[in-house]
From Swiss-Prot:
Record keywords, A-Z: ATP-binding, Cell membrane, cGMP biosynthesis, Glycoprotein, GTP-binding, Lyase, Magnesium, Membrane, Metal-binding, Nucleotide-binding, Receptor, Signal, Transmembrane, Transmembrane helix
Segments crossing the lipid bilayer: 459-479
Location (main, coarse): membrane
Signal sequence annotation: 1-23
Span of domain Guanylate cyclase: 876-1006
InterPro entries named among the record's database cross-references: A/G_cyclase, ANF_lig-bd_rcpt, Cyclic_nucleotide_synthase, Kinase-like_dom_sf, Nucleotide_cyclase, Peripla_BP_I, Prot_kinase_dom, Ser-Thr/Tyr_kinase_cat_dom
Protein name as catalogued: Receptor-type guanylate cyclase gcy-29
EC number(s) from the headed UniProt entry: 4.6.1.2
EC top class named in words: lyase
CDD domains referenced in this protein's UniProt entry, alphabetically: CHD (cd07302), PBP1_NPR_GC-like (cd06352)
Residues the entry annotates as binding ATP: 503-511, 527
Record lineage: Eukaryota, Metazoa, Ecdysozoa, Nematoda, Chromadorea
Glycan-bearing residues: 161, 240, 407
Length: 1069
């Protein structure tokens, strides 16, 4: 007998070797957890906690249970590998959880793949475990791996259009593995690795600068990826090197993927506030790519809440991600096992169930389940897809900011695998970078790192061109000013005194009578007769004469102003002819003569009846002229009054005496001219001019008058003078509407004007109580007379308001133009009607053409194109002739014959229109019809012609001759089938004609036939028998009229309408 010890061992081995036995009560599975010596108890507790969770959810229970076997590994002698073998051979486990350490995971996963046992790697981070050809049953549930965080980093960079980057790392195996994984992910996104800078781990920050590593990075990249192993914290060293090399500015982007290559490494950060403080101190102003929960306490708090419900054991927070991954791994295994057992179609004969590792792996592909915090997705390689985030370490803020979310989603776009996962980057914050724009800088300078992308030749050429252009502009300005000065010095507006012929009173009356129109309105008496002159040969002008006491020297401003006045051209501006000065002690201002005098003459002429049309037209002309002056280089009028508005022979108002008021006063102040006049009427109205001047201008004028000659003349801005024009325009509107000034009738206007001229404050213009006026115009006038210049409306607003209130659409001439326009519109309407009639006639002609010729032939001929002859392989041609038509014609008048044929052929046309046939022509009583031409219709042409002939025969049975009701027409019909040629014959009078043997035979069939019968050829008979047997045919015999031997013809006698019913009845029988 065996000793007791060996007997016990043998029994234990035999018991453990027995596979899972399926009973009606429960299936028990075994899992082997290979932990480390330090945390074996903790890992076992987490598995028990997960088992309890699955039991509560009903996954485990009466029918399924999982037995947890924990062994220690991760020792110096690969104890975990031996333990894995023992678990398989002795314990007969159904799945592995672990090993906890990476060095033992690879051999255990290889053995599990060979044994077809599922293995859950909850701490696997190395990229080598992504090889599904080697690790066929490995399911990775770890929160992050080299390939996953590398893909997340590449996705973030591609989302921000980063195309080039450099990698800096220390020399070492772990760093090399990280670099390989990261470069692979970058290449897949089209991102170029410009440089890979490697340095010794013992290097200091100063060494990195002195050895040229930092310069190499600066010269090749603006986006830098620091990848360091965890054996020594090099992040601070590299960060100090960036400060020493002046590379800590926002011009450079540091993207730090927090990668853990192996489980033996400590994670670069933990989570929560401690992690934020650590990262901010070591990596300010950088972007960290890390697990979405890496800088938050959410995962820890949620897991602690679950853990505390079971047992209170201290949790090493550094291993939090591994603990959560182990917890979720057990839940995944339980759910997959349940699904796997349900997928078994039948129980094995021996009742023993073995877990198929590869089948379980396939079930995990694309699986989604609820994890501790969110849903967990397995990709096409049965690897957990973790949610990552991009964190911006802003040294100016207390907290690390989440700028982008990098989530995994299932997609079917351009995917051939069973399950495809796509990384989707969504921005949380868009403008976060510490730059003026808040956006990430470009991955490469615009001109390249060595200015290789910029051709400075072009810049130099452009700079030279710009300098040349600037010099040219300055030279042009100088030349323009010189030319302008030369032009001003030439004084185009100067009129020499010898060119001016002063007219006396008799000469003026003679000239005015010749130029004035003979209308009742030409008899207006003028209260103020200006001086008249002839300038040059025949230019009739009026002038203002001033005594000149000293020679006048014009300033540059005076020269520019007078030149602008000479150049002013507008329908409502009176042309300025020029100035005669420094001759005969006289200063003459010459303006073009307007035959109907001034607006003042019309307003205060009692004989002249001024209706609303005149008022509206006058106001409109003044506003148009003022608007032109205000928008022109002159800028203002400066002396607007009712006598400075002239009326030409077409009753169009023209502004005159513009822009000269200020120079005249200045010259008078300096003693160069005398503005006093001798004419009493003119003196009176000269005094009244102050009533058109606003208060602020009157005050300024009085101040200028009181100044000494050596004191500077106080001028006014263009805007102030425009506002002054609006004030005067308000007064003129009132005069036009009411033929009086806007003051009370009891007021002495002469005294009021004297006070205004002396600068005293006088009453404002106002609308008198007995005057009725449009409310809009009342408001407009009150605005025009406002004491505050800035409150006065612009001339554009005045024009629009007066056009609406006075309903003006132009001057008096415009009314006549509108009548002519209405006539033109009526003429246009008449032309349109006639054009419509022509189009209708054209349509009728077109319809007639389509009746004479086939439609497609007519379209081609209308387009000017020729229609080529065409041979038709199969068609049927029919001829008809009325028997005894000649005799009938001899007994009838021509009109009766025409009416007969018109009625008969109209009936024939009706019969033809019901079938696919075309009437070729009619000659007297002969009628020619074809089917299959010009549109081919297979073999249906013979049936169409047959139906037409029978229809004509039926028609004639009831047809009555209009002028002989008792007379019955008899017709001969004949047709033939075969080849026919068709062509258009003639140019000026085209005809559509048919040619060929078939046409000739069809004519013989008609001519050799009998009245009231239809004669057909044997070809037509064969087509009817083969294709349309419902038609009734009788043989006639050999027709000797046809020049062919033994030519047999037939009679078409009718159509059996019940043919197909009889045929169907025969078949049914």
């Amino acid at each position: 007998m065996l000793p007791n010890f060996w007997n016990f061992q043998f029994i234990f081995v035999i018991f453990c070797w027995i596979p899972i036995v399926v009973s009606d009560e429960k299936i028990v599975l075994k899992i082997g957890s290979i932990s480390s010596r330090d945390n074996a108890k903790m890992l076992e507790s987490i598995l028990e906690m997960a088992k309890k969770k699955m039991t509560e959810q009903g996954v485990l229970g009466e029918k399924l249970d999982i037995q947890i076997i924990t062994v220690e590994g991760c020792g110096a002698s690969f104890e975990g590998v031996a333990a894995a073998a023992e678990l398989y051979h002795v314990q007969k486990v159904d799945a592995y959880f672990g090993p906890y350490c990476s060095k033992e995971l690879s051999p255990v996963a290889t053995m599990a793949s060979y044994w077809n046992i599922p293995i859950f790697a909850y701490t696997a981070t190395s990229a080598e475990f992504a090889n599904t050809k080697v690790y066929k049953t490995l399911l990775r549930t770890s929160f992050q791996s080299l390939n996953s965080i590398s893909e997340a980093t590449a996705a973030f960079m591609a989302h921000h259009n980063i195309t080039k980057a450099a990698i800096v790392a220390n020399i070492g195996t772990d760093s090399f593995e990280k670099i390989q994984s990261l470069e692979k992910a970058l290449r897949s996104r089209g991102i170029t690795v410009a440089r890979r800078v490697m340095f010794e781990e013992a290097a200091s920050a100063q060494d990195l600068v002195d050895n040229g590593y930092m310069n190499e990075l600066r010269d090749n990249a603006r986006v830098i990826l620091p990848i360091f192993s965890s054996t020594r914290d090099l992040s601070t060293v590299f960060r100090n090197a960036t400060w020493l090399a002046n590379m800590a500015s926002p011009e450079f982007i540091y993207i730090n993927p927090l990668i853990v290559a192996r489980n033996s490494e400590e994670p670069p950060v933990f989570y929560g506030k401690m992690a934020q403080k650590s990262i901010k101190a070591e990596n300010p102003n950088t972007i960290q790519i890390y697990n979405s929960y890496g800088f938050s306490d959410d995962l820890l708090n949620e897991f602690l809440a679950i853990f505390d419900q079971n047992q209170r054991i201290y949790i090493d927070e550094k291993d939090l991600f591994n603990y959560v991954a182990l917890y979720e791994s057990f839940c995944v295994f339980a759910k997959l096992t349940e699904k796997y057992l349900h997928s078994l179609k039948e129980k094995p004969e021996d009742g023993k169930i073995r877990i198929d590792g590869k089948a379980l792996w396939n079930m995990a592909v694309g699986m989604t389940f609820q994890g501790v915090l969110d849903n967990v997705i397995f990709d096409n390689g049965a690897e957990r897809m973790t949610s990552f985030s991009a964190f911006y370490v802003d040294e100016k803020r207390d907290q690390i900011r989440t700028v982008s979310l990098i989530n995994s989603t299932v997609t079917s776009k351009n995917c051939m695998d069973p399950v495809c996962i796509e990384l989707v980057v969504s921005d949380v914050v868009t403008k976060f970078w510490s730059s003026p724009s808040g956006k990430l800088p470009d991955s490469e300078p615009e001109c390249g790192f060595r200015e290789e992308n910029c051709d400075y030749t072009q810049t130099i050429v452009i700079a030279t061109a710009v300098v040349c252009i600037i010099l040219t502009v300055f030279l042009g300005i100088w030349l323009r000013r010189a030319c302008e000065t030369s032009a001003l010095d030439k004084m185009p507006w100067r009129v020499f005194r010898d060119d001016v012929q002063i007219l006396d009173e008799e000469q003026v009356k003679s000239v005015v009578s010749l130029n004035s129109a003979s209308t009742k309105m030409s008899q207006v008496e003028t209260k103020l007769i200006k001086n008249h002159a002839i300038v040059g040969v025949n230019t009739h002008a009026v002038y203002d004469l001033y005594e000149q006491r000293q020679n006048i020297r014009f300033t540059r401003e005076d020269l520019i102003l007078l030149t602008k006045m000479k150049q002013a051209v507008h329908d409502n501006i009176n042309p300025f002819i020029g100035v005669s000065f420094n001759e005969k002690s006289e200063l003459l201002l010459l303006w073009k003569f307007c035959s109907r005098g001034t607006l003042q003459d019309v307003i205060y002429c009692e004989k002249f009846a001024m209706d609303e049309k005149f008022q509206g037209a006058f106001v409109r002309d003044i506003t148009m002229g003022l608007e032109y002056l205000h928008s022109s280089p002159i800028g203002y009028h400066g002396g607007l009054a009712c006598w400075s508005v002239l009326i030409d022979k077409n009753w169009m108002l023209k502004l005159t005496d513009y822009a000269v008021c200020d120079p005249l006063k200045r010259w008078e102040k300096h003693g160069r001219i005398n503005c006093k006049v001798d004419n009493e009427a003119e003196k009176q109205w000269q005094k009244m001019a102050s009533l058109y001047v606003p208060p602020e201008i009157r005050t300024a004028n009085e101040k200028n008058r009181l100044k000494r000659m050596d004191q500077k003349w106080q001028g006014q801005t263009i805007l102030k003078r425009q506002q002054s024009d609006i004030y005067a325009f308000g007064v003129i509107i009132y005069e036009i509407l009411f033929r009086s000034l806007p003051y009370d009738e009891k007021v002495d206007l002469t005294e009021l004007a004297q006070k205004a001229a002396e600068g005293d404050k006088i009453q404002k213009p106002s609308i008198q109580r007995n005057k009725k006026l449009n409310p809009d115009l009342i408001a407009l006038l009150q605005d025009c007379w406002s004491d505050q210049p800035d409150m006065r409306p612009t001339i554009r607003r005045v024009r629009l308001a007066t056009e609406i209130a006075l309903k003006t659409k132009g001057n008096l001439v415009d009314s006549m133009m509108r009548m002519m326009e209405e006539y033109a519109n009526n003429l246009e309407k008449l032309v349109g009607e006639r054009t419509k009639l022509a189009e209708e006639a054209n349509l009728r002609a077109e319809r007639l053409l389509f009746q004479l010729l086939p439609k497609h032939v007519a379209i081609e001929l209308k387009a000017g194109r020729t229609v080529a002859p065409k041979m038709y392989d199969s068609a049927t041609v029919m001829f008809s002739d009325i028997v005894g038509f000649t005799k009938l014609c001899s007994a009838s008048t021509p009109i009766e014959v025409v009416n007969l044929l018109n009625k008969l052929y109209s009936e024939f046309d009706t019969v033809i229109s019901k079938h696919d046939c075309y009437k070729v022509e009619t000659i007297g009583d002969a009628y020619m019809v074809v089917s299959g031409i010009p549109i081919e219709n297979g073999q249906r042409h013979v049936a169409n012609i047959s139906a037409v002939t029978l229809g004509i025969m039926d028609l004639l049975k009831v047809f009555e001759v209009p002028h002989r009701r008792d007379y019955r027409l008899t017709i001969r019909l004949g047709f033939a089938s075969g080849q026919v040629s068709a062509a258009v014959v003639g140019l000026s009078s085209p005809r559509y004609c048919l040619f060929g043997e078939t046409v000739n035979i069809a004519a013989v069939m008609e001519s050799s036939g009998e009245g009231g019968r239809v004669q057909i050829t044997e070809t037509s008979k064969i087509l009817l028998e083969n294709e349309y047997p419902e038609f009734i045919i009788e043989i006639r015999g050999i027709n000797k009229d046809v020049k062919q031997d033994d030519f047999v013809t037939y009679w078409l006698t009718g159509k059996d309408e019940d043919y197909f019913k009889k045929k169907n009845n025969t078949f049914d029988f």
